[in-house]
């Protein structure tokens, strides 16, 4: 069983990418569980056809500790098992704690004991704070992929996440599997992302082009592969899934200084 965490800045398309990627893996016959690690609890809605899933934290609050796996785990497209960790009520407590509680709960209920090929953790945002670092800090996820684009703030966030991976890699055994570009159609984006990944000592594992069908599928509460399986974008997600399934390059990243990051962007005509 491979345990993979997907990180990236807020709004980069991390949850969309994760769900379309897992739909492609599921279609190919892989057994998958997605654990949504975002208080918004939107990591599984395309797999579940728009079903707003009750989160682990809400279930615990309403029903106490005596819960069954079926209460928090729902099957969706291609039999993909879906869990949303959720978080505390707004303004109260640390959302990262929800991730810790959820993973511990899933372990105690035997969720990891089935014949899974993959567990994906879709993790909130720009910071790798204590709670959100849980999947890598505790060595739950052995592989990390960072979703980025050719925009400055996306690369700042990716570089910060690389710092977090570097910090925990030595103790937890986690490695960076690569950068996934979710294209924003920025000039020289492909070249910039390849250079950025190389600078980290990693690879651009896949460049996902921008296509409006992704939004159309989202409005219809489906992954692209379910919504329009024969379209070009569905094949892009299949190719991304194949790249990750066959990946053999796992590194401790070498994050760069901010000055070097800005220099890299100037070299590729993004700044200046």
From Swiss-Prot:
Reactions catalysed: N2 + 8 reduced [2Fe-2S]-[ferredoxin] + 16 ATP + 16 H2O = H2 + 8 oxidized [2Fe-2S]-[ferredoxin] + 2 NH4(+) + 16 ADP + 16 phosphate + 6 H(+)
Organism encoding this protein: Alkaliphilus metalliredigens (strain QYMF)
Protein name in UniProt: Nitrogenase iron protein
Molecular function, one GO term: ATP binding
Gene behind the chain: nifH
Family: Belongs to the NifH/BchL/ChlL family.
Subunit structure: Homodimer.
Chain positions found as ADP-ribosylarginine: 97
PROSITE patterns per UniProt: NIFH_FRXC_1, NIFH_FRXC_2, NIFH_FRXC_3
Cofactor(s) needed by this chain: [4Fe-4S] cluster
Superkingdom of origin: Bacteria
Keyword tags: 4Fe-4S, ADP-ribosylation, ATP-binding, Iron, Iron-sulfur, Metal-binding, Nitrogen fixation, Nucleotide-binding, Oxidoreductase
Signal peptide start and end residues: none
ATP-binding among keywords: yes
Residue positions binding [4Fe-4S] cluster: 94, 129
Record SUPFAM superfamilies: P-loop containing nucleoside triphosphate hydrolases
Family annotation (HAMAP family): NifH
Residues reported in the UniProt entry to bind ATP: 8-15
Role according to the record: The key enzymatic reactions in nitrogen fixation are catalyzed by the nitrogenase complex, which has 2 components: the iron protein and the molybdenum-iron protein.
């Amino acid at each position: 069983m491979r345990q993979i965490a997907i990180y990236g800045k807020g709004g980069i398309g991390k949850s969309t990418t994760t769900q379309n990627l897992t739909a492609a893996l599921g279609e190919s016959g892989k057994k998958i569980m997605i654990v949504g690690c975002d208080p918004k609890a939107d990591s599984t809605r395309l797999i579940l056809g728009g079903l707003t899933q009750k989160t682990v934290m809400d279930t615990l609050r309403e029903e106490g500790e005596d819960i069954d796996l079926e209460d928090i785990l729902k099957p969706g497209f291609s039999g993909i098992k879906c869990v949303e960790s959720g978080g505390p009520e707004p303004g109260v407590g640390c959302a990262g704690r929800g991730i810790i509680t959820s993973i511990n709960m899933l372990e105690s209920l035997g969720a990891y004991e089935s014949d899974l090929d993959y567990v994906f953790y879709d993790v909130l945002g720009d910071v790798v704070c204590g709670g959100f670092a849980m999947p890598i800090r505790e060595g739950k996820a052995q592989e990390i992929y960072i979703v980025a684009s050719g925009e400055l703030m996306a690369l700042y966030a990716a570089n910060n996440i690389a710092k977090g991976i570097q910090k925990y890699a030595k103790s937890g055994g986690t490695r960076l599997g690569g950068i996934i570009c979710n294209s924003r159609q920025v000039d020289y984006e492909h070249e910039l992302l390849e250079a950025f990944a190389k600078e980290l000592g990693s690879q651009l594992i896949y460049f996902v082009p921008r296509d409006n069908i992704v939004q159309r599928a989202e409005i219809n509460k489906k992954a692209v592969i379910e919504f329009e399986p024969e379209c070009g974008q569905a094949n892009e997600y299949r190719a991304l899934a194949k790249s990750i399934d066959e990946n053999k390059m796992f590194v401790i990243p070498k994050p760069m200084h901010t000055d070097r990051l800005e220099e890299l962007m100037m070299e590729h005509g993004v700044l200046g």
